[in-house]
């Protein structure tokens, strides 16, 4: 892309998992449900939808909206949590956001009119040399107007799992198990 510098850093690993809801059982996501997390342009559009979460492997509880500087042997990680609540009827909306919501951070409850669905979490790990981290020589976004802000981290998801598979995922999550 124009005004980009450097090259693409490929992930060392990617973990995709579904998580339950702290308050209620989850229902299966409908096929083709669309979800967004984060915002590609929070500098120009404002921070309301930004959800950047960065950490280092082995430091899961230390989350930041800044690029981390990890200790030697630890990987830089992007943690992307998608909404875990759904309006129960729409697989998309005009803004691609209002048909889904995040659970309340304090109570874990979905907003009124929403039901809990398996919450998708994607953890992307990168092997980035510590000296590169210390010099601030890695960046994420490719939008010049965002100044390579780590706060612009974002992702899109469309559920293409079969109905049968989503029923299995919901049952597994509701039973509190880790399922392959």
Predicted regions mapped to residue ranges:
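Primary mode marks residue(s) on the alpha4-beta5-alpha5 output face of response regulator receiver
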Residues: 1-80, 87-180
């Amino acid at each position: 892309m124009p005004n980009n510098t450097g090259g693409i850093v490929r992930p060392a690993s990617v973990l995709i998992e579904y998580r339950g809801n702290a308050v209620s059982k989850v229902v299966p996501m409908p096929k083709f449900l669309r979800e967004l997390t984060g915002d590609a342009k929070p500098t120009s559009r404002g921070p309301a939808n930004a959800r950047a979460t960065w950490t280092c492997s082995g430091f899961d509880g230390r989350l930041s909206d800044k690029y981390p500087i990890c200790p030697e042997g630890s990987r830089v990680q992007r943690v992307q949590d998608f909404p875990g609540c759904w309006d129960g009827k729409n697989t998309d909306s005009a803004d691609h956001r209002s048909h889904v919501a995040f659970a309340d951070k304090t109570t874990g409850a979905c907003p009124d009119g929403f039901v809990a669905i398996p919450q998708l979490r994607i953890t992307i790990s990168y092997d980035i040399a510590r000296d590169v981290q210390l010099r601030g020589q890695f960046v994420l976004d490719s939008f010049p107007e965002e100044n390579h802000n780590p706060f612009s981290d974002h992702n899109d998801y469309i559920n293409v799992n079969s109905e049968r598979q989503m029923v299995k995922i919901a049952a597994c999550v509701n039973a509190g198990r880790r399922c392959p």
